[in-house]
């Protein structure tokens, strides 16, 4: 279910790290447990292994919403073929061009083109140009400017972008969409539901029963038994298919959201944000590091632009793009630098569009919890099958020895006196009972419950500003023990403004008071701001305020530049950019070399970045009058004092410096791409302090995490003083005087040995001046210590840490596409409070699954014991096939819907994280389950054996008395499940009604179940072998079921040991003990 772009890299990104899901059945299992798979990047062999681990009765039903391994292989084959085809075409053109390298080329006229709805070039010609990387054709069209003219595009201002222009371009060159394979139809889900082996057997039994019933009793009375079983099976099939189909539609919608990338385009001279689907041929698109190339196109201009084309070519090679290699392919990622491109082909006309149209997106996904529950289902299924076979043997033995009786008390089988039809009908009845026991005993609804709760949670999380890219992240988030959060934009508002400035050797007050500076230093500052930026300024012709675009830091600096009197476009035209060193989060600075317009030889190299890092490279500084002075130790101390003062006020400190250079020393244009900009002997211009306010509510969110047993750690590129001030403001630090290792600098952490790093990682609350690699080292150290780590990130260099973490959380607003594709969840509003809401939902997923397990196993145990004991002792079962199918429907589908959609509560954030290797069935669940199951078994078996006298039916004839008694047992059993559903909502809370009015679906399902039960008992007796009950018996039935509530209340007062029950069994059994030890060792040495 990952986004289109990430799906191509799935196979390459597989890895076998990350802790798995833990034991399948309590503590059952070993280090080689096939049902224990990693949460991220599980090897294909592991995924194949668990499917073959044990007897699986209903594979088609069991493996719903798990990874379709065969389809994954087919998808890879399709991708490989399309890549190979593209390779051949491009190789042919390159070979042709290589032969022309030493041939003197004459001026070639542009080939004849036919106008396309008023444009100077046709769709197929434009598509072929970029698809084939045909540089010769580009030159014949007049280069990039010629193609732009044909597309009626201004390379500076873009297209006009009005509705008529966009419509004309879509009509001429297509839209940036591609035909998607339709999702599976409802009929396909119906067919899958029909493949359930036990249901097939029941349908066969229904057909045989129908035929024999009509033969022996006539059509008027003989069709009831067979038809009622068939109808019950059909109902199960329809409800199952409907539920699956609904979940499928939800996942499709979420998949659409994941692919709907927002990007900037230049239209009418201004940068605006549009959906990737709204892109048209002729659009001018700015590109920066981490962006996905949104369509095929040609590079207009770029600086140090490198592109990762591995998603299209399959080769992990970074390709440099310039005027000699200008073709950009849709779907590729910008690895470095920035530039602008002209869109030439969109949608299905691109290689990416063809690729996406050829593969299916909805490939399913494995989640550890799904696999663990499949392990539980397999174990219980084997027990159920064994019991059903035992019941079958016992009933057949009793039948053929004359120990089974008809409702009127007569013997069912008398040797030599029974016809073949009657004998077969009796055997079919017995066989149906045994198969139905399997239906009830095998909890196929467990994996479905995971899908239901995940789909529900994902839909609700969208409203809470979180887009889930990987299903298993939902459940893993519930186990998170630590969150490593960025500062900027996550803990802060990302609304930056320059509030302090130190230029010319003194503080400017206010910070835009340019009058204190000479014209020479002012022009240098403005030149450095305008040229050394990836942002832009649009100046409206009507005199309105300029529109500033770019990253928050760039916008703050550009806005400050405007206050200094900077005219952005004029300043940029006064000098030309020779080379750019894009801002790098490792080096924490960016630079640009510009050739001054009025001089043939003078070059300025401007640097901007972290204040103390720029300061270390400066040998001199400029005074307010423009005079140059050496950087003395006293002056360095003065600068450092100003930096510390700003940092103590939680300001981000950015320094500006420059140096002069000679044009003769600048490398020639063909070698300039490898030029390393000089960063020594710099001249300090000054420092600005940028304020980024702390987000409202962050302190409360951090406090909530602490109460939930989750430690929040701040990892930032800012210096330690700024980091300390923000951490105190956000509540991450409580003591301003803490020292290492609680607050540590990235380089200090980096210098530690592996063992020291692990020990320090436990204590770290704040890491300042950290690089993306430091964040990665912190994540690895924490995971080695057994933590389940969630990490936030927005930059391209954050991708390794996001991928390494148990849960990678990227930012939806400031995050790059590379970061988003390496993440598991996208935080759409970049807000830390949304991260905490994701934790709540993660815990809710796990809690809801446990509620459903408790509820379902109670039904399993009670139904099995009642029918087995009754069958063995009397030869008859109180709950027949149709009744058990109805119970199965309540339990598997309606129960899953009711309990899997419980919204998260504050109670979830008042307990520690759930360990992923903790048993799925806790001691609290065992206690509740045993109490409820015992209560139901005792009550219903008492009714089975003493019901006639207890219900005062002795005066009735035997057949009617038995029918009333069995109906009463069936009715009480179903009502017990209804009342127990309320108990299951709050397994460890006394108030089971808390928040119940907020869950409308739960209330609706309970109401529907009760109404249908009343209809079945009162009006559908012919089909279900029941009879109408008096209102007195209804009251008694409700009273017995109601007793579940006070019993559960008292039961919850019984304390349970903290140690899992499985450990007690392991202590008693040497083999189990070894297995448990092995599992413990595995946990210690895994990446959990």
UniProtKB/Swiss-Prot annotation:
Leading EC class: translocase
EC id: 7.2.2.10
Top-rank taxon: Eukaryota
Catalytic activity: Ca(2+)(in) + ATP + H2O = Ca(2+)(out) + ADP + phosphate + H(+)
Calcium is among the record's keywords: yes
Disordered: region residues: 1-32
Subcellular location per the Swiss-Prot or TrEMBL entry: Cell membrane
Membrane topology: Multi-pass membrane protein
Regulation of protein activity: Activated by calmodulin.
Self-association state and partner proteins as the record states: Interacts with NOH1.
Record remark: domains: The N-terminus contains an autoinhibitory calmodulin-binding domain, which binds calmodulin in a calcium-dependent fashion.
Name of this protein: Calcium-transporting ATPase 5, plasma membrane-type
């Amino acid at each position: 279910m990952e986004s289109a772009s990430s799906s191509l890299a799935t196979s390459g990104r597989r890895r076998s790290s990350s802790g798995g899901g833990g034991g399948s059945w309590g503590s059952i299992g070993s280090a080689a447990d096939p049902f224990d798979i990693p949460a991220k990047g599980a090897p294909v062999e592991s995924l194949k292994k668990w499917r073959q681990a044990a007897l699986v009765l209903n594979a088609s039903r069991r493996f719903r919403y798990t990874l379709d391994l065969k389809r994954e292989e087919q998808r890879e084959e399709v991708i490989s073929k399309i890549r190979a085809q593209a390779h051949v075409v491009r190789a042919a053109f390159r070979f042709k061009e290589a032969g022309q390298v030493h041939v003197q080329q004459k001026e070639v006229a542009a080939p004849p083109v036919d106008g396309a709805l008023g444009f100077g070039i046709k769709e197929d010609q434009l598509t072929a140009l970029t698809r084939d990387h045909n540089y010769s054709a580009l030159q014949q069209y007049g280069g990039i400017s010629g193609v732009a003219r044909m597309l009626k595009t201004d390379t500076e201002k873009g297209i006009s972008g009005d509705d008529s222009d966009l419509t004309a371009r879509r009509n001429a060159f297509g839209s940036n969409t591609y035909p998607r394979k339709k999702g599976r139809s409802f009929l396909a889900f119906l067919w899958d539901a029909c493949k359930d082996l036990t249901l097939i057997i029941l349908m066969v039994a229904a057909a045989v029963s129908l035929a024999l019933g009509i033969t022996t009793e006539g059509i008027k009375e003989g069709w009831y038994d067979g038809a009622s079983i068939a109808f019950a099976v059909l109902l199960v099939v329809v409800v199952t298919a409907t539920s699956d189909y609904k979940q499928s539609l939800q996942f499709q919608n979420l998949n659409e959201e994941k692919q709907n990338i927002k990007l900037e385009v230049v239209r009418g001279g201004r940068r605006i944000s549009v959906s990737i689907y709204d892109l048209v041929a002729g659009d001018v698109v700015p590109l920066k590091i981490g962006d996905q190339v949104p369509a095929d196109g040609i590079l207009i201009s770029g600086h140090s632009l490198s592109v990762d084309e591995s998603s299209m070519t399959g080769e992990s090679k970074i390709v440099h793009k310039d005027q000699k290699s200008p073709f950009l392919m849709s779907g590729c990622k910008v690895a470095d630098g920035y530039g602008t491109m002209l869109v030439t082909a969109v949608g299905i006309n691109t290689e990416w569009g063809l690729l996406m149209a050829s593969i299916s997106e909805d490939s399913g996904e494995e989640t550890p919890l799904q696999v663990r529950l499949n392990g539980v289902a397999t174990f219980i299924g084997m027990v159920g099958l064994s019991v059903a076979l035992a019941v079958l043997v016992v009933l057949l033995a009793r039948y053929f020895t004359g120990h089974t009786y008809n409702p009127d008390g007569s013997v069912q089988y008398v040797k030599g006196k029974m016809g073949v039809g009657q004998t077969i009908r009796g055997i079919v009845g017995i066989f149906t009972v045994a198969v139905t026991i399997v239906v009830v005993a095998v909890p196929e609804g467990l994996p479905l419950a995971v899908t239901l709760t995940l789909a529900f949670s994902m839909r609700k999380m969208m409203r809470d500003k979180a887009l889930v890219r990987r299903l298993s992240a939902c459940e893993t988030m519930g186990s998170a023990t630590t969150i490593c959060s960025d500062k900027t934009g996550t803990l802060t508002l990302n609304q930056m403004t320059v509030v302090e400035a130190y230029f010319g050797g003194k503080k400017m007050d206010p910070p835009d008071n340019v009058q204190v500076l000479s014209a020479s230093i002012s022009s240098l500052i403005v030149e450095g701001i305008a040229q050394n930026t990836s942002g832009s300024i649009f100046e409206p012709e009507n005199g309105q305020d300029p529109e500033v675009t770019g990253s928050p830091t760039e916008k703050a600096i550009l806005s400050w530049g405007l206050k200094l009197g900077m005219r952005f476009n004029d300043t940029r035209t006064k000098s030309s950019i020779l080379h750019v060193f894009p801002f790098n989060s490792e080096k924490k600075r960016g630079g640009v070399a510009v050739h001054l317009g009025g001089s043939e030889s003078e070059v300025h190299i401007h640097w901007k970045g972290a204040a103390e890092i720029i300061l270390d490279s400066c040998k001199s500084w400029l005074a307010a009058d423009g005079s140059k002075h050496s950087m003395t130790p006293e002056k360095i101390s003065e600068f450092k004092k100003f930096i510390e003062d700003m940092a103590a006020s939680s300001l981000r400190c950015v320094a500006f410096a420059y140096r002069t250079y000679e044009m003769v020393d600048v490398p020639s244009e063909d070698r300039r791409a490898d030029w390393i900009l000089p960063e020594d002997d710099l001249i300090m211009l000054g420092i600005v302090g940028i304020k980024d306010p702390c987000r409202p509510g962050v302190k409360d969110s951090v406090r909530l995490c602490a109460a939930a047993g989750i430690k929040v750690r701040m990892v930032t590129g800012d210096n330690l003083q700024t980091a300390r001030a923000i951490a105190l403001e956000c509540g991450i630090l409580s003591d301003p005087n803490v020292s290492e290792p609680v607050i540590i600098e990235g380089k200090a952490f980096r210098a530690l040995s592996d063992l020291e790093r692990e020990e320090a990682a436990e204590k770290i609350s704040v890491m300042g001046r950290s690089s993306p690699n430091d964040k990665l080292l912190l994540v690895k150290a924490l995971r080695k210590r057994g933590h389940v780590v969630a990490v936030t990130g927005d930059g391209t260099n954050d991708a390794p840490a996001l991928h390494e973490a148990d849960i990678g959380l990227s930012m939806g607003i400031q995050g790059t596409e590379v970061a988003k594709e390496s993440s598991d969840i996208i935080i759409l509003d970049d807000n830390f409070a949304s991260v905490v809401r994701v934790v709540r939902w993660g815990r809710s997923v796990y809690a809801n699954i446990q509620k459903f397990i408790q509820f379902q196993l109670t039904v399993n145990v009670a139904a099995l014991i009642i029918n087995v004991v009754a069958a063995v002792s009397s030869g008859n079962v109180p709950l027949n096939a149709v009744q058990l199918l109805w119970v199965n429907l309540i339990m598997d589908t309606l129960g899953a819907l009711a309990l899997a959609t419980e919204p998260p509560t504050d109670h979830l954030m008042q307990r520690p994280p759930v360990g992923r290797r903790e048993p799925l069935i806790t001691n609290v669940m065992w206690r509740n389950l045993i109490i409820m199951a015992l209560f139901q078994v005792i009550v219903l078996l008492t009714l089975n054996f003493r019901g006639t006298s207890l219900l005062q039916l002795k005066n009735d004839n035997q057949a009617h008395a038995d029918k009333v008694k069995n109906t009463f047992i069936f009715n009480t059993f179903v009502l017990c499940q209804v009342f127990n559903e309320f108990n299951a909502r709050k397994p460890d809370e006394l108030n089971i009604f808390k928040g119940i009015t907020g869950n409308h679906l739960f209330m609706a399902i309970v109401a529907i179940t009760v109404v249908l039960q009343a209809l079945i008992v009162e009006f559908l007796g012919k089909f279900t072998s029941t009879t109408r009950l008096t209102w007195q018996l209804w009251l008694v039935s409700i009273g017995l079921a109601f007793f579940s509530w006070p019993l559960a209340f008292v039961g919850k007062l019984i304390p349970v040991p903290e140690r899992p029950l499985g450990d007690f069994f392991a202590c008693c059994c040497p083999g189990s003990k070894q297995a448990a030890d092995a599992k413990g060792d595995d946990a210690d040495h895994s990446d959990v």
